[in-house]
Amino acid sequence: MATIGMGDIKKGVRLELDGNPYKVTEFQHVKPGKGAAFVRVKIKNLKTGKVIEKTVHAGDKFEVPELEQKTMQYLYDDGEMLQFMDTTTFDQIGLTHEQVGKETFDFMIDGMEADILFHNGEAISVEIPQTVVLKIVETPPNFKGDSQGGKKPATLESGAVVQVPFHVLEGEMIKVDTVEGKYLEKAK
């Protein structure tokens, strides 16, 4: 199994800790005036969704978890589980809201393709594309003089609320960054 060290740590890197797969969500390289450099990281447990903070020192090594990734289609939310279907075998699996994570679920719509991560044959996590195109279902109307480059809230078809420029109208399709939860541009 491959290993990674302190210098390999960056956002999105996956590592194994105590037999559980984690994903780095934030990191900060620290070079103190005295002593060795280290990295402060926030890592998300891919099985439980829980985020912990850890300090990584120069000699620390982590194994890279053996994860299988399958592209599946999101079907629906039955209240307890989010249902996904393998489009080649038509097998269905369910993941809890905790496994998916609110930051991911906020940008999911029925029929969307998502990458499901499997660890030891068990579905553990969902990853959606970094940018998605969604329709605005509700946003306040524009008023004359709204040209100062301000922003207003817009509710998307997925239920997420993002800040959009005043010129963006209800019913328009926009491109959204799912990692930052931000408006990028009008969809072309």
Curated annotation (Swiss-Prot):
Q: Tell me if Protein biosynthesis is a UniProt keyword of this record.
A: yes
- A Pfam cross-reference name: Elong-fact-P_C
GO terms for biological process?
A: peptide biosynthetic process
* Keyword field: Cytoplasm, Elongation factor, Protein biosynthesis
Q: Which domain of life is it from?
A: Bacteria
Report the PANTHER family cross-referenced here.
ELONGATION FACTOR P (PTHR30053), ELONGATION FACTOR P (EF-P) FAMILY PROTEIN (PTHR30053:SF12)
Q: What does this protein do?
A: Involved in peptide bond synthesis. Stimulates efficient translation and peptide-bond synthesis on native or reconstituted 70S ribosomes in vitro. Probably functions indirectly by altering the affinity of the ribosome for aminoacyl-tRNA, thus increasing their reactivity as acceptors for peptidyl transferase.
Q: Under which name does UniProt file this protein?
A: Elongation factor P
Q: Which organism is it from?
A: Sulfurovum sp. (strain NBC37-1)
Q: Upper taxonomic classification of the species?
A: Bacteria, Pseudomonadati, Campylobacterota, Epsilonproteobacteria, Campylobacterales
Q: Which gene encodes it?
A: efp
